[in-house]
């Protein structure tokens, strides 16, 4: 949830050796029980919106501003592609970011929809609320709830960072109003590609959208690494290229930030469920 973290030391200075991976995703789905009114969406790995100081839990760090903060605030959140970028809230005051990829489908991080590493279907997030193009206290397109949460069994079972992707199916078709972002799956190296990370960080005023553009520094089979500044709350934010096409999902922070890559297999799956 409100987590952009270092997950086992993601720092890279040069092209890393790819992690052992087959890129074979193992998708699973969970139907949201809207009668559930107690409990929290809190993951032990997540931070609440109000972050008094960069906290660390289980080796995860939420502080991923690298050097001087290069992020800029997006004031016009109703322009494209900003209106397709969403803030996600959960019970307990936890937040994430994401992007609409169809009229009723949001792409985000796996740890935004499930705690990860527990193997339990009881650890999906609760009280999901999605606000496209939010601008401070203003929700220009209103908010939507969730009907279904989807992620990867590898994330549920072992918190495999290669599988840290999530999908939220909405109870509305707001994307017909806002439009949505395209995505692209490729096995080619993305190193050197110009990319933007845009979302809702928890160290800024609530509901404000922030952005930074830079180069992808290195590529693995299912991950990309970059030094664009982020913070807890930007988990799930789209990492998109100059054509506004999503190439990764922001998930982790540290001396290098990183995201789960859109592989051809994941892209095909997203197309099947959106």
Identify what each model region corresponds to.
Residues 3-12:
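C-terminal segment of classical bacterial N-terminal signal peptides
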Residues 11-100:
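Protease-domain processing segments flanking chymotrypsin-fold serine proteases, especially trypsin-like
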Residues 61-83, 91-95, 114, 119-175:
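Conserved catalytic-core segment of clan PA serine endopeptidases
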Residues 80-129, 215-219, 251-255, 259-260:
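Catalytic histidine site
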Residues 92-95, 106, 112-115, 136-138, ...:
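Solvent-exposed loop/turn segments at secondary-structure junctions
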Residues 136, 146, 161-234, 260-266:
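Chymotrypsin/trypsin-fold serine protease catalytic domain
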Residues 229-250:
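Catalytic nucleophile loop of clan PA
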Residues 247, 251-274:
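C-terminal cap/linker of serine protease catalytic domains
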């Amino acid at each position: 949830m409100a987590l952009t973290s270092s997950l086992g030391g993601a720092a890279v200075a040069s092209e890393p050796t790819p992690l052992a991976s087959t890129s074979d995703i193992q998708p699973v789905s969970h139907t949201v029980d809207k009668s559930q009114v107690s409990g929290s969406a809190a993951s032990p790995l997540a931070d609440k919106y109000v972050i008094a100081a960069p906290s660390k839990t289980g080796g995860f760090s939420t502080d991923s501003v690298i050097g001087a903060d290069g992020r800029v605030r997006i004031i016009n959140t109703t322009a494209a592609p900003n209106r397709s970028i969403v803030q996600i809230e959960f019970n307990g005051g936890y937040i994430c970011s994401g992007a609409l990829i169809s009229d009723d489908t949001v792409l985000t991080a796996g740890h935004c929809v499930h705690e990860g590493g527990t193997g339990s279907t009881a650890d999906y997030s609760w009280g999901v609320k999605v606000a496209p193009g939010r601008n401070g206290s203003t929700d220009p397109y209103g908010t939507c709830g969730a009907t279904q949460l989807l992620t990867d069994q590898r994330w549920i079972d072992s918190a495999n960072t290669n599988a840290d992707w999530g999908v939220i199916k909405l109870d509305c078709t707001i994307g017909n109003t806002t439009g949505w972002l395209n995505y692209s799956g490729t096995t080619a190296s993305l190193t050197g590609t110009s990319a933007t990370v845009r979302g809702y960080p928890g160290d800024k005023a609530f509901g404000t959208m922030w952005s930074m553009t830079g180069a992808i520094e290195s590529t693995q089979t299912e991950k990309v690494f970059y030094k664009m500044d982020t913070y807890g709350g930007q988990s799930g934010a789209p990492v998109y290229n100059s054509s506004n096409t999503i190439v990764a999902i922001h998930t982790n922070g540290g001396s290098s930030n990183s995201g789960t890559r859109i592989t051809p297999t994941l892209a095909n799956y997203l197309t099947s469920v959106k």
